Amino acid sequence: MNNKKNYDLKLIKQKLNAAMVLIEEVQNLTEEFPEVNTSYLAGALDDLEQQYYEIEELQD
């Protein structure tokens, strides 16, 4: 059961990491298109990072 929990947490971390990378890429693209307001993404990225680190603590 513990192995399944660790596998699930690892999978969640991978998905959170992918989401963070995607948000960062969108933010980078907005440098080319400053008229697009993506300020809400900064908050979303912070939330994802927090979740990522909480999961890391659970794995330890």
What is each of the regions a protein language model found here?
Residues 1-34, 51, 56:
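N-terminal acidic leader/helix
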Residues 10, 35-46:
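Short, charged, amphipathic alpha-helical segments
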